[in-house]
Amino acid sequence: MPKSRISLVHQSSNPFSRNAALALAEVSFLNEVITTIAYNPEGAIAHTLHYLPKKMRDRLTQELGRRTWMPPERASIRSHPGREIARLALTKSGLNRRLGLAYLGSIDWVCTSLDCHVAKYHLQGLDAIYAYEDGAATSFQAAKQQGILCLYDLPILFYRLSREIQAEEAQRFPELAPALQAAQEPAWKLERKEQEIHLADHIFVPSSFIKRSLIDAEVKPDKVSVIPYGAPVDYFYPQSKPDQPFRAIFEIGRAHV
């Protein structure tokens, strides 16, 4: 019996998307990974960096290292780096703010472009597509027309509950309001999120709390599977900081209730 062919789509390399790809590859389901930048520390780009001045080389190596994604066994990686490179250049230089190009410096610009590209060029011959929030609406619509299964991974709260919580926090702490992004997302982006959960044939989440946020949005409970995240704490080693600014993480998505 032939194995299923599943392609996984995520705009960047992070632990949950990499491990989802590895899990699919282990059972020979993974066809390919589709992303923006997939850096190979042993590849040609890494070797080219050695010819740059040390300060520039170290900075680029650190930035690219965060986007390391090696292809799992018997699978390939398709990278479409153009918009992500442009976004990084605009945001790191501050040009997006100075030139009034805020949208071109946003991750939404990258996600929607990759989503459209997948819909046009990467669905042929697939049994299923595995995608993530903000990067699946267009490809899921095209996949449905071709009878392709749509699998959706939501690692954070669905926006309705997240927006409600952040709106309350913004009222309590007005000085934090600019940092609470979920309460400020545009209507077109929220509509894409709604399309994604309703087009998905099955949704995977890491906690019962996130599952509840989907059920509250009228998603049927049997359409959602909880697969808890977890990792041995001994494997965590904080990276040294090259600068002094204090950084806080606002986290509401993964607690179990």
Label for each model-derived stretch:
Residues 240-256:
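Conserved donor-binding/catalytic core segment of Leloir-type glycosyltransferases
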Residues 220, 228-237:
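Short beta-strand->alpha-helix junction loop in the catalytic core
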Residues 115-126, 137-141, 145-146, 158, ...:
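Membrane-proximal helix-turn-helix segments that form the acceptor-binding/catalytic region
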Residues 209, 230, 242:
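Carbohydrate-associated surface elements
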Residues 13-18, 39-42, 47-48, 107-119, ...:
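An aromatic- and histidine-rich active-site surface loop
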Residues 46-51, 80-106, 146-191:
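Acceptor-binding helix/loop patch of EC 2.4 sugar-transfer enzymes
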Residues 2, 35-109:
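A conserved catalytic-core segment of Leloir-type glycosyltransferases
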